[in-house]
Amino acid sequence: MEVYMDNSATTRTFPEVAELMTKIMCEDYGNPSSLHMKGVEAEKYLRYAKETLARILKVEERELLFTSGGTESDNMALIGCALANCRRGNHLITTQIEHPAILQTMRYLETQGYRVTYLPVDPCGRIRLEDLRRAMTPETILVSIMHTNNEIGALQPIEEAGALIKQMNPDTLFHVDAVQGFGKSRIYPKKMHIDLLSVSGHTVSYTHLRAHETLRHLV
């Protein structure tokens, strides 16, 4: 008998979901941007998905952007925000135990002239808010902290970190990689002071972007 214990990373697809997806791929396969009947039917599924996610997160539908996966969501959030806000500063903050999708993107941004501070963690894998406070500067344009660590499961004090960031500089953007945490923890971007939230349903993902924020297009 097989025992699978990695559901937080990738969960086995429910039979009813697989059945619906098979129907969509075989029958309702139109481009949701097209005006013909197949496109209209496909757009209904997309709209329903956005309505459902917006209701769960307590955000507006227009604040949700669908992507191909968690890595694209993280890349778009970090690079897009860095490029769009480079005139305000060039300092970014993250942690030493982020997913490679974050760490490698931060290293790329360093090659483009951005300064990055990597926060250490305590023995339980959690950041210290005092370290975050000391790392913040007037040049800090973005802070990225994961919700749940993909290796050790450590939960970060996201709401407290978000409140601290906004207290010190309301213009500093707060990005949270919640690929591992969404669906297991209650995550409300507005309540938790989150400007950008990356989530994956494996492998269709989305990024939440606060309504008045902008991203520089990557493509």
Whereabouts are the PLM-identified features?
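Extreme N-terminal starter segment of soluble prokaryotic enzymes
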Residues: 1-4
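Glycine-rich phosphate-binding segment of PLP-dependent enzymes
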Residues: 9-59
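Conserved beta-loop-alpha segment that forms the PLP phosphate-binding cup at the N-terminus of a helix
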Residues: 41-54, 59-89, 98-105
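PLP-dependent aminotransferase-like
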Residues: 79-139
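Active-site phosphate-binding strand-loop segment of PLP-dependent enzymes
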Residues: 117, 121-181
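Conserved active-site segment immediately N-terminal to the catalytic lysine
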Residues: 173-176, 182, 188-208
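Conserved small/polar residues in nucleotide/adenosyl-binding loops
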Residues: 207-217
